[in-house]
């Protein structure tokens, strides 16, 4: 069996560890105006779940956080007015909210794997 990364061999040896991938809501809900991005995130999801199935027998948990729109460099080209409106109406999340979700995932009991955690801004429903 191939190793997915240098770290998983150490996690397998110690029979514990967590690998969390950052995916996107686009990995489970097609975004029609971003077909390449959507395809790449569907691929991430396939990688997450095949990896999880390979290493779970060794006590290594693998999951993905799938956020909706987050204030990141990907939005740097948005006009200022659009960004302000999106922030005001609650259609964007802050990076700290994604980080807190990852912390939730890795602090569950060792016999629990949060496989996928979809997080959305309050005014977004997909």
Name these PLM-found stretches.
Residues 61-71:
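Conserved SDR Rossmann-fold cofactor-binding beta-strand/turn motif
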Residues 40:
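Active-site helix of classical SDR
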Residues 31-35, 90:
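Active-site loop immediately N-terminal to the catalytic Tyr-X3-Lys motif
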Residues 9, 53-56:
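Alpha-helical segment proximal to the catalytic Tyr-Lys
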Residues 24:
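Residue(s) in the substrate-gating loop at a strand-loop-helix junction
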Residues 7-15:
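A short helix-coil junction within the Rossmann-fold of NAD(P)-dependent oxidoreductases
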Residues 1-6:
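Short, small-residue-biased leader/transition segments that mark boundaries at the very start
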Residues 64-65, 85-126:
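C-terminal helical subdomain
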